[in-house]
């Protein structure tokens, strides 16, 4: 199987989907690997480093001729022209956010594997490290944009406690998963007060136990509680993600209007559509805008801003799946590996993820029925 590692075109995206070390694992297993020129530069990997591990450096167009194209984020619209029948595209594709790309993949007969929907032992195994990074960075960005020169309230989120008692900021975090706890931990490290809004009762108990000795309040998620707590936020971070599907707009414009002027609002799951009515995707180079008096931060690829860290994390997670596909062929790998099967969102043009199908009102096919 010919495997290609392509350079990301998304603005500000410095990650690469495969490290030189992982290229060596593929070539040692007898697979041919081509790497687009400068694909790894943003993560600190030169073309020579890939060549030394057995890869061939190629152009953008040549890379897209491969049987298996390994990416970080969804293909750019300029890359749709390279799609070909039965080609496999791997990455954090977040297809629920764009019907256009789904329809193009269906038209051509592409197979799309989305790392964020791979579930192993009940957990989003590949997404978790990226969620952790996004959560931590969101807390930092909240502090940064709280400063007056960025349009924020002009507050220091840590407060001041040398001979005075100026309280720190309040972070309200919507959701209680991996991204949420990582955001909370950074906020606590900054001496901020944290409120977590969570729906699941078991998770609420877990969070209460986890933060029993910390300045954290855990609140049951209801529309009424959300509306009440958001008013307290100096920084509001939404972490809600529904695997494979576009989430509902749970944070309404009226709720945003009720927030403090100059407060900061961040939606980590904006790459899947987001849960905030007033949010829209932004970029790492132009990350914020003001609406209803609130600073909105809508960067969909936050880990791309710290590529040296995040590339190592994602590459460690995806290589075993990629090797299995290459060694066995996709169909046998899907049959043998239930977790991998959950990542197949589109198989040869047929939608095989129920959340994705419902998001775009498309027909859904069970993956194991399709490949039999």
From Swiss-Prot:
Keywords: NAD, Oxidoreductase. InterPro entries: Ala_DH (IPR008141), Ala_DH/PNT_CS2 (IPR008143), AlaDH/PNT_CS1 (IPR008142), AlaDH/PNT_N (IPR007886), AlaDH/PNT_NAD(H)-bd (IPR007698), NAD(P)-bd_dom_sf (IPR036291). One of its GO terms (molecular function) is alanine dehydrogenase activity. The active site is at 94. It catalyses: L-alanine + NAD(+) + H2O = pyruvate + NH4(+) + NADH + H(+). May play a role in cell wall synthesis as L-alanine is an important constituent of the peptidoglycan layer. This is Alanine dehydrogenase 1.
């Amino acid at each position: 199987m010919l495997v290609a590692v392509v350079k990301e075109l998304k603005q500000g995206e410095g990650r690469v989907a495969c490290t030189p070390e992982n290229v060596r694992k593929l070539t040692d297993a007898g697979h041919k690997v081509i790497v687009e020129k400068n694909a790894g530069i943003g993560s600190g990997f030169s073309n020579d480093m890939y060549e030394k591990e057995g890869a061939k450096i190629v152009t953008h167009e040549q890379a897209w001729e491969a049987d298996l194209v390994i990416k970080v984020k969804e293909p750019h619209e300029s890359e749709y022209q390279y799609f070909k029948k039965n080609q496999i595209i791997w990455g954090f594709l977040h297809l629920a956010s764009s019907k256009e790309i789904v329809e193009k993949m269906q038209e051509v007969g592409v197979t799309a594997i989305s790392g964020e929907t791979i579930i192993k032992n009940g957990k989003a195994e590949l997404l978790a490290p990226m969620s952790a990074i996004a959560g931590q960075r969101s807390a930092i960005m909240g502090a940064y944009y709280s400063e007056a020169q960025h349009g924020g309230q002009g507050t220091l989120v840590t407060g001041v406690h040398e001979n005075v008692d100026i309280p720190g900021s309040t972070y309200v975090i919507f959701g209680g998963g991996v991204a949420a706890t990582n955001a909370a931990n950074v906020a606590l490290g900054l001496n901020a007060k944290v409120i977590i809004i969570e729906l699941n009762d078991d998770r609420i108990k877990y969070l209460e136990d986890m933060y029993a000795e910390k300045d954290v309040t855990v609140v049951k998620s209801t529309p009424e509680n959300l509306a009440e707590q958001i008013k307290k936020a100096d920084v509001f971070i939404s972490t809600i993600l529904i695997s494979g599907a576009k989430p509902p707009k749970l944070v309404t414009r009226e709720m945003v209007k009720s927030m403090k002027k100059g407060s900061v609002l961040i939606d980590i799951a904006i790459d899947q559509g987001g849960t905030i009515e007033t949010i829209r995707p932004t970029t790492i180079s132009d990350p914020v805008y003001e609406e209803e008096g609130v600073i909105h931060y809508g960067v969909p690829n936050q880990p791309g801003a710290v590529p040296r860290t995040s590339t190592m994390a994602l590459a460690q997670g995806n290589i075993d799946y990629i090797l299995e596909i290459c060694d066995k062929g996709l169909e046998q790998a899907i049959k043998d590996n239930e977790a991998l099967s959950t990542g197949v969102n589109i198989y040869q043009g047929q939608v095989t993820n129920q959340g994705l199908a419902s998001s775009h009102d498309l027909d859904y096919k069970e993956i194991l029925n399709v490949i039999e």
